[in-house]
Every structure is written in structure tokens, then in C-alpha cells.
């Protein structure tokens, strides 16, 4: 019964958040069970473009390392801030949300080539947190009960964790940079004098993912109108 309740709760999570979180968990579980190897997942341009192992363009965003503190920490922030974006500023705009993932993924992959980065899931997490924080400037965040600050400081606070653990912050900086590019092109530049939206979601994504808009001028035919017994 507990599993049924958990499954019901999970199915109530918005589609993009649910799909991405599940893909990350399943990928990590497959590696933990030795069904997959990280060497089959990491981004390698030679293997992608010469050996046509195109799945690496996606799988490098799904693996967050072995089960442990870092994995659960990343999953917590992926689930929380991806969901808040999808239920907040992207509510009813699934296609736009997916396009943000695609834009961020492509830009991170191109920039990751310069830094020889093999796994970019943490960068994607940083991008999600950054975009949410810039769109929620008045929200106060309680950081693990230790600090309280305004939302725009959250991405920088998160970057302090790998520094404390002695890890590189290059991936986090990449995610913040890509998040800022998206935020600027989507939220800042269109509101400037002479500015316009440069990031336009392809129409085929809208057809696939968004519910069709109702025509306000549409009048139902008589047989479509509720009768006395239906009212």
C-alpha cells in the first residue's frame, strides 16, 4: 500500500520533472548494479561523431556518480527546482520547458568541449537552480537550516559545497553561465528598448507537448451543448 501511495504521488509530479528525475535514478541504479558502465555514458566527441554513439549526448546528463551523498544532494535539487519551475513560470508551457532543456544541453555540450567535461548533469542542475532563482528574487531560501538568504544567492551557495569537498567548480560555473544566457535572452533582452524574443520554441514541440488552445470565439454546436439532464 505504501508503494501504491508513493507511485500515486510520483505520477502527480509534472511530466518533465518526473521523466528527467526517473531517468537519472534509473541510469545511476543501472551503473550501481553493473548493468552499465560510466564508460558507456560519458560524453566523447570522437565516439559520438566518428562511431555514431549518439546516446552519449543524452546519457552524460543522466549520470551523477555512484550512490552517495553527492548523488542524493543533486537529485534533491533537480527534483525540487525542476518541479518549481515546471509548476511556476512554465506552468502550461511544457514545450517551452523542454526547449529550455534542449537549449541548455546544446550550449553546455559545445562549451564542455573546451573544458573536456565528460558528465554535465550537475551543470544542468545549476542551470535550473539559476533560472529559478532569478525568476524568484523575493523568495528567501533556508539553506539546510544554516543560512537564510535571497534566492539569487542560491546558485553561488551551492557552488561552495564542491569547494569544501575539494572538487572542481568548473561544471557548476558552466551551468550558471548557461543559465544566465537563457535568462538574459528570455527575460531581459525582450524587455529592453528594441529587444525581442530570440528563443522561439519550435512549433512541432508545441504541437506534441502543449494542450491546444481553446478558441474564445468558438460556439459549440447544439448537440455539443449540455441538455437539461446534463446541467
Swiss-Prot record:
Compartment list: Endoplasmic reticulum membrane
In Gene Ontology terms, what is one molecular function of this protein? signal recognition particle binding
**A Gene Ontology biological process term:** protein N-linked glycosylation via asparagine
Record SUPFAM superfamilies:
Rhomboid-like
Q: Which UniProt keywords apply?
A: Endoplasmic reticulum, Membrane, Transmembrane, Transmembrane helix
Tell me which parts of the chain lie in the Cytoplasmic compartment: 1-22, 80-98, 179-231
Name the protein family.
Belongs to the derlin family.
Q: What is this protein called?
A: Derlin-3
Origin species: Bos taurus (Bovine)
